[in-house]
């Protein structure tokens, strides 16, 4: 029998970032986005005719940076500030985190296309 597919959208994430290399546009400034993810699952149907138990996301065996997938999405994108590791103002953003006014996440590069 063929494989079946289902999908789930995880949304409601609010994050900000800036593209500091975009020096000639407003994208160089910190700006926010509503982020969502659409995850696809493929496999055989189980005895309930499900490809995936969406409630099982919290029990997923595959981890991202040591976290369950949904916990990782929350950690990375729920009211956070995403900063590129080569941003010349990185220390200023880290200071904001130390001061308790931002949850900073440092990644190799920023941009909606990079997530």
Where are these regions (language model features)?
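Charge-rich, low-complexity N-terminal segments
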Residues: 1-115
